[in-house]
């Protein structure tokens, strides 16, 4: 299901916060508080590709934070399994302390509302959503289970959204922060593409 341009489905669910506090009523929209948010799903704790992605999101947390973007992760595991995973060192298959909320979707309602439940296994596919400050999904990527995400590309998409909002220009293929955009007109694209002639 493609959710880009749609309102993000809100949810209230148990979560473990960055201070290891467990809350029963984590409200995504309330937590986002008008800021852009990266919401990402992984299949299960204590598995194989998942810890590499979560550790990478955590490693780059400060890059998202300085762009005023919050990160929230979701899987079908209980908050107690999330907590145990955080309390396990990476060398032992854990993830260590994490600087963003990890939500528990034990009833699978959240992953179903985002349309990313695996059709046979009942777990989430590797999905990421960039929700803007107006609560609109602006970018989504969904990977099959064996394939890890490129977390730095999500930062690039955050930068592209910010660039478009500030300047009204569109971002060409492989655009990176600091590069020129394209004025969304026939003249603008002709001017941009003329450098390839």
Curated annotation (Swiss-Prot):
Annotated Thioredoxin domain residues: 2-163
Subcellular compartments: Cytoplasm
One BP annotation, GO: cellular response to stress
Active site, UniProt feature: 50 (cysteine sulfenic acid (-soh) intermediate)
Top-rank taxon: Bacteria
Catalytic activity from the UniProt record: a hydroperoxide + NADH + H(+) = an alcohol + NAD(+) + H2O
GO-annotated molecular function: NADH-dependent peroxiredoxin activity; thioredoxin peroxidase activity
Alphabetical list of Gene3D superfamilies matching this protein: Glutaredoxin
SUPFAM superfamilies assigned: Thioredoxin-like
This protein's UniProt keywords: Antioxidant, Cytoplasm, Disulfide bond, Oxidoreductase, Peroxidase, Redox-active center
GO cellular component: cytosol
InterPro entries (UniProt xref): AhpC/TSA, Peroxiredoxin, Peroxiredoxin_AhpC-typ, Peroxiredoxin_C, Thioredoxin-like_sf, Thioredoxin_domain
One Pfam family matching this protein: AhpC-TSA
EC numbers on record: 1.11.1.26
Top EC class for this record: oxidoreductase
Function: Thiol-specific peroxidase that catalyzes the reduction of hydrogen peroxide and organic hydroperoxides to water and alcohols, respectively. Plays a role in cell protection against oxidative stress by detoxifying peroxides.
Miscellaneous comment: The active site is a conserved redox-active cysteine residue, the peroxidatic cysteine (C(P)), which makes the nucleophilic attack on the peroxide substrate. The peroxide oxidizes the C(P)-SH to cysteine sulfenic acid (C(P)-SOH), which then reacts with another cysteine residue, the resolving cysteine (C(R)), to form a disulfide bridge. The disulfide is subsequently reduced by an appropriate electron donor to complete the catalytic cycle. In this typical 2-Cys peroxiredoxin, C(R) is provided by the other dimeric subunit to form an intersubunit disulfide.
Similarity comment: family membership: Belongs to the peroxiredoxin family. AhpC/Prx1 subfamily.
Subunit architecture: Homodimer; disulfide-linked, upon oxidation. 5 homodimers assemble to form a ring-like decamer.
Protein name (database record): Alkyl hydroperoxide reductase C
Native source organism of the sequence: Buchnera aphidicola subsp. Acyrthosiphon pisum (strain APS) (Acyrthosiphon pisum symbiotic bacterium)
